[in-house]
């Protein structure tokens, strides 16, 4: 309900991890509201908050109701822009709910889960897979949602959690690239 007309994303640089976040966000928005317009832009920076703020302000001027920042520290500028214009923001990596009262939630990398798993594998299981990577995703608890803003209606929270659970179970295929070169 919060972004039925248009939603947007501000990426730092279009590298694969950033594109995957944006692809999932756009697919989720389209699944919830098939006619929603999705906007995307890049700041070409992960640090300078003014660059992300400018990208977000442009998107907000085009009608975006929700801005998802996928630009590290630069993205804090996008969250500021959302608040400034009375729109909503979504944080990334860590729980950015604390940034301002217009942050809906955050797409979190659960680094604690990765660290705990690596330690558990070594200490309890005596397994050290040197030279290989552990991959964390929704299915193994490696990513998830941060705190959800109280402004989000309870029925919408329930729907979001139900979809997140379906992703966790592997029943929802989350795209890793955007349709029509949208990101």
Language model segments and positions:
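A residue-level marker of the well-folded mature domains of exported/periplasmic proteins
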Residues: 1-183
């Amino acid at each position: 309900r919060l972004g039925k007309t248009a939603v947007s994303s501000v990426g730092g640089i279009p590298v694969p991890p950033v594109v995957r976040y944006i692809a999932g966000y756009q697919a989720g928005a389209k699944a919830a509201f098939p006619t929603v317009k999705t906007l995307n832009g890049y700041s070409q920076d992960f640090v300078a908050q003014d660059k992300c703020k400018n990208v977000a302000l442009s998107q907000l001027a085009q009608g975006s109701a929700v801005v998802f920042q996928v630009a590290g520290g630069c993205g804090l500028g996008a969250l500021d822009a959302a608040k400034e214009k009375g729109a909503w923001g979504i944080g990334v990596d860590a729980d950015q709910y604390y940034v301002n009262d217009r942050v809906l939630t955050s797409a979190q990398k659960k680094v604690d889960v990765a660290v705990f798993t690596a330690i558990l594998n070594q200490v309890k299981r005596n397994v050290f897979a040197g030279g290989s990577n552990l991959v964390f995703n929704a299915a193994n608890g490696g990513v998830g949602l941060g705190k959800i803003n109280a402004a989000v209606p309870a029925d919408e929270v329930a729907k979001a959690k139900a979809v997140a659970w379906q992703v966790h179970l592997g029943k929802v295929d989350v795209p890793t690239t955007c349709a029509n070169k949208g990101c």
